[in-house]
């Protein structure tokens, strides 16, 4: 396992799902994790990981609010003196066919999935620049590349994440900061658990490795890009989809 010993990592949307998996893997790798979420369940997740030996603490943060993000960042800097890694994992879906989609459904997804990257990254980057080191890794998606019915809003944000990644890496590389993204494919989740078995089988049939992914799979994908060993990799979207859509 790559080591993150002594590093401070922010993981947004860490209360459950892929974010929870990233928190667990990063703690196993030795990082101290700030779990950000608007859900109070984040505290329970942090307590569980901490009880298993992880160095993790919960901050209730609204990533769309510059004030909320700024206060959380300053609290981390005051206590730990630095931020090495920012994982922009938090995201939402509001699926509906395009002609029936409301402006609220469109704007809410854009705000959380894309605009929040501006807020969090701009708050953290000055500290990374000062330290001469940093890793920013954001959540894209296979559907940002292949699209999906009823997800015009979501797909637009995830394609935007990859564009944001390619652009920002050109600005901050000279500061020792790399910027990358991870695009998960079909991942086991509370949503997939509620799907009919035939739908899951049809999805797995499209995945060459023969199974759906797990939060742990995603955690290791993020761990690689967050490691010092990945220091020459920047501006990419890592497609973690079992070969469902090779890039």
Q: Which sequence ranges carry the predicted segments?
A:
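Substrate-binding pocket helix/loop in short-chain dehydrogenase/reductase
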Residues: 97-98, 105-110, 192, 203
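C-terminal helical subdomain
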Residues: 174, 181, 204-229, 233, ...
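Canonical Rossmann dinucleotide-binding motif of NAD(H)/NADP(H)-dependent dehydrogenases/reductases
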Residues: 2-34
